[in-house]
């Protein structure tokens, strides 16, 4: 079974078929996507692998999936680590496509296509709305921080001037996100269920719906790794290193972390009790909050899987306090 790696840029798609060693370049537009599909079907390709490229890969990946082809989108870091392990230090579009194909052959054959939300245009639209809101919030935060740091009154005024407009745009985004969820009953039903959890607000609920379609379908460890809050070991010989988190969906993790801070310190009695126990056992506050975030994910996962609302008397088993 041939595997094709596809290196993506805004304008082009560079594809490399591993078994037949054929390379082609296509425009990254609807016509190019059709040409790519036809070429893959002609080669009898079983798996196509894209590097995540800031969203430029989405439309092409959607075209492949609509044509019945298996398409994966992978973290570029994983491909670079694979290339370095293979001794490939040079970097061109064609070499990148070949390395992506090699990575796919080594790790993805036999697995279903992995593209979050791309087979669901309604979720994709919601994800873009949620992402746009986050861009506006980040921009506002950055301007405010810069304004706080300057001493010139004129510079401060210039930096603060756009904030009211950004506030209005964020409010508009909130209304659009709420409307998008309300229009789609599966999303609306999920939002109502998640809204029963003390400490979860509209922003975190929308992020969960948009960016975590796997909620309720994986076990708690898989879900924690997906979000990027699973503790990874760092041991060697007799040395036991400190556990640490890495990878995952950073934007989602950041939003859920802020929700957890409020839930574990003020709004959610279950998470408050867990946070207190972790601190009493010597955990640092940030480590304890990450553990509470994992607990929150475990609870949410069970609620969605069981189709149950929040019930503090029927919570799933979580990791021990020492974790």
Where are these regions (language model features)?
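Phosphate- and other anionic-substrate recognition elements at nucleic-acid/protein interfaces
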Residues: 1-154, 164-167, 265, 287
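A residue-level signal for conserved active-site and pocket-lining positions in enzyme catalytic cores
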Residues: 100, 136, 256, 282, ...
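Short alpha-helical scaffolding segments that buttress acidic/His motifs in well-ordered protein cores
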Residues: 103, 126, 194, 208, ...
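Short helix-capping/linker segments at secondary-structure and domain boundaries
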Residues: 107-113, 143, 213-217, 262-270, ...
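Phosphate-backbone recognition surface of nucleic-acid-processing proteins
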Residues: 202, 207-281, 285, 312, ...
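Basic, amphipathic alpha-helical segments enriched in Lys/Arg and hydrophobic/aromatic residues
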Residues: 280-323
